[in-house]
């Protein structure tokens, strides 16, 4: 990874999903519609300071957006604040540079009155379109999607989490020159090790931008924050377990885990006709090397024993990992008392092929069934 000062420049004028954020978006969307009505063929070449100044004036005229600063209450916001609020919408993916359009879900976001739905729409828009290197007059680059890149880096990390320090290191990446859609965790940690002093200096100098990004992540659906870490909501029990202090979590050996997953992929290729989910027989782009006996409860031999694993899709991995399903010695799926009937009806006929059920794997599955029974007994 190379260090660039074109870091992820996040701008926040208003809190996300607040009345002022929504009002700013509403005015921008209505103005863009007016521009398109007058000139249906409007493109970035038609953009001018006159068009931008008109938008600024409309935002300054909104009663909802009047200043709340002491001594300036009820007065129009200054131009710096107005520009910042427009760039916030551009960077987060709600409106396009040069005011050429807005996200296809922007109007639905404005119209919904239900907070849960608004949070979902916000998360999707930011995930699909956020580009923190944008400003109002930057040429669009659909390749660069910062939150998408960050979330994919999280998903591809076998530990299922990212630390705040790792996220700060990602902020130093110029995605315009990077070809992948995520950053391998071992390379990211090596970059941190080699650039500790620079990262420490960046933390002090760009404290606000780091705080803005951390705050944005807290607004995204299905992203769970604990102390200085994030993980997917569905993975939080696996990642953090029942422990309050993450320092007690057992650490995986990256190389041994790669070997473990590779062996499961080889087994899948041999018996499933390719690297596929061992249950669905589908070649998902992301497959999880799911432990049968939980990693945290395994000794060193068990932790990297491919017989103590199944290659699964994310959905089935979550159900299996959280003990909502298990399997008997014949490969038949077993239902937890905690699993809803509609989910069970969807998956119940999927089974493990007998060729995958060697004696060692059966022993691990017996342990897994006992864990499922224990979880059910708590309810």
From Swiss-Prot:
One annotated GO biological process? DNA restriction-modification system
Q: Is Hydrolase among this UniProt entry's keywords?
A: yes
Q: Does the keyword Nuclease apply?
A: yes
Keywords linked to the UniProt accession: Endonuclease, Hydrolase, Nuclease, Restriction system
Q: Care to name a GO molecular-function term for this sequence?
A: type II site-specific deoxyribonuclease activity
The catalysed reaction is: Endonucleolytic cleavage of DNA to give specific double-stranded fragments with terminal 5'-phosphates
Origin, by domain of life? Bacteria
**EC numbers, comma separated:** 3.1.21.4
- Return the Pfam families for the record: HNH_2
Protein name per Swiss-Prot or TrEMBL:
Type II restriction enzyme HphI
**Organism of derivation:** Haemophilus parahaemolyticus
Q: What is the lineage of its organism?
A: Bacteria, Pseudomonadati, Pseudomonadota, Gammaproteobacteria, Pasteurellales
């Amino acid at each position: 990874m190379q260090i660039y000062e074109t870091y992820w420049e996040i701008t926040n004028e208003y809190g996300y999903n607040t009345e002022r954020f929504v009002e700013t978006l509403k005015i921008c969307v209505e103005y863009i519609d007016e521009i398109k009505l007058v000139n249906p063929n409007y493109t970035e070449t038609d953009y001018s300071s006159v068009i931008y100044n008109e938008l600024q004036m409309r935002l300054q005229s909104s009663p909802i957006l009047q200043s709340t600063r002491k001594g300036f209450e009820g007065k129009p916001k200054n131009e710096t604040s107005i520009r910042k609020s427009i760039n916030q919408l551009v960077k987060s993916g709600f409106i396009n540079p040069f005011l050429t359009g807005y996200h296809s879900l922007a109007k639905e976001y404005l119209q919904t009155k239900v907070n849960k739905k608004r949070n979902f729409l916000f998360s999707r828009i930011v995930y699909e379109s956020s580009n923190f290197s944008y400003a109002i007059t930057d040429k669009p680059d659909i390749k660069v999607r910062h939150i998408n890149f960050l979330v994919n880096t999280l998903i591809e990390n076998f530990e299922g989490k990212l630390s705040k320090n790792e996220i700060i290191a990602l902020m130093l990446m110029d995605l315009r020159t990077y070809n992948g859609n995520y950053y391998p965790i071992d390379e990211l940690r090596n970059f941190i090790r080699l650039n500790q002093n620079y990262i420490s200096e960046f933390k002090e100098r760009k404290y606000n931008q780091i705080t803005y990004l951390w705050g944005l992540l807290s607004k995204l659906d299905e992203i769970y924050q604990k102390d200085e870490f994030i993980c997917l909501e569905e993975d939080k029990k696996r990642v953090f377990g029942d422990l309050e202090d993450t320092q007690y979590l057992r650490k995986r050996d990256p190389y041994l885990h790669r070997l473990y997953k590779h062996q499961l992929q080889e087994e899948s290729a041999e018996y499933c006709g390719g690297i596929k989910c061992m249950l669905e027989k589908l070649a998902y782009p992301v497959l999880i090397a799911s432990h049968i006996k939980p990693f945290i409860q395994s000794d060193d031999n068990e932790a990297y024993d491919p017989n103590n694993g199944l290659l699964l899709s994310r959905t089935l991995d979550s159900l299996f990992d959280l003990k909502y399903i298990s399997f008997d010695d014949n490969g038949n799926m077993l239902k937890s008392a905690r699993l809803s009937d509609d989910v069970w009806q969807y998956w119940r006929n999927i089974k493990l092929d007998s060729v995958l059920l060697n004696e060692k794997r059966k022993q691990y599955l017996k342990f897994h069934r006992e864990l499922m029974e224990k979880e059910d007994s708590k309810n």
